[in-house]
From Swiss-Prot:
Organism: Gluconacetobacter diazotrophicus (strain ATCC 49037 / DSM 5601 / CCUG 37298 / CIP 103539 / LMG 7603 / PAl5)
Protein name listed in UniProt: Ribonuclease P protein component
Family note: Belongs to the RnpA family.
PANTHER family: RIBONUCLEASE P PROTEIN COMPONENT
Gene Ontology molecular functions: 3'-tRNA processing endoribonuclease activity; ribonuclease P activity; tRNA binding
Top-tier EC class: hydrolase
Length: 116
């Protein structure tokens, strides 16, 4: 996740994860995970709908999700998986520690290696 090369950018990539991957909801976010057949670093995409708020609020939510991923990845790198993190309205009001806890729980439930 350290560089932009490991991000999902294209709509087709997001749709592939959404249709074939596992969806795990939590109060702060929704995680969609799709395993890959390699051990390359995780490719991660972030999305926040307009339902959450205006552009300023959505971008802040996206930044908080990105930082939560960085915190989790520092402990143990995520490999061989494509992830999509969807910001919810509840993301805004949660403390950062609660958001990181939500991410850890959803990764564990999705069975992502490196999240145990």
């Amino acid at each position: 996740m350290a560089d932009r090369a490991h991000r999902l950018k294209k709509r087709a990539e997001f749709l592939k994860v959404a249709s074939r991957g596992r969806k795990v909801p939590s109060p702060g976010l929704v995680l969609q995970a799709l395993g890959r057949d390699d051990s390359d670093p995780a490719r991660i995409g972030f999305t926040v709908t307009k339902k959450v708020g205006n552009a300023v609020v959505r971008n802040r939510t996206r930044r908080r999700l990105r930082e939560a991923v960085r915190v989790v990845e520092r402990e143990e790198p995520l490999n061989g998986v494509d992830l999509v993190l969807i910001g919810r309205d509840g993301t805004r009001g949660r403390t950062f520690a609660a958001l990181v806890g939500d991410l850890r729980r959803t990764l564990r439930k999705a069975g992502v290696r490196g999240a145990e």
